[in-house]
């Protein structure tokens, strides 16, 4: 029986699928990457894993530490899935306009949700900006570290090793 030693080992290495109609219409082989095969069913699982691994490598996060992110999308799910499997707590700051299904899914994955009013980014209480301040506050008292994942500005997203992972 084959098995993965841990959930994070299932992130990436997703298969390629030949897109038959597109291939026939173009005369080229067109392939799609099956990112839905990641544990959180999204390409954002990759970003989550690399952000977390980067924080661990830099000594900013140890098991039991806290990952904070402001997100209305799949990054929160990726951070919750991968973070929980690696022994981290996840706090997601989310606009109160998001669907109940998304909120329920995040909670089922173990994330703590902080719901804030949906306001423009220029407002200091925008969910992304709020999450940065919250991460800084949590970091002051978390003995195992706390990070702001900061998906929108994280340089780990554009580093050479990340871009070429399969």
Where are these regions (language model features)?
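Phosphate-handling active-site elements
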Residues: 56-65, 87-94
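Conserved beta-loop-alpha segment that forms the PLP phosphate-binding cup at the N-terminus of a helix
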Residues: 45-53, 67-88
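Fold-independent oxyanion-binding glycine-rich loops
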Residues: 13-14, 33-35, 71, 96, ...
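Single conserved hydrophobic/aromatic residue that forms the stacking wall/gate
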Residues: 157-166
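Short, small-residue-enriched loops and turns at beta-alpha junctions
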Residues: 38-41, 120-124, 155-156
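Positively charged, low-complexity intrinsically disordered leader regions
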Residues: 1-63
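Active-site-proximal loop->helix
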Residues: 75-136
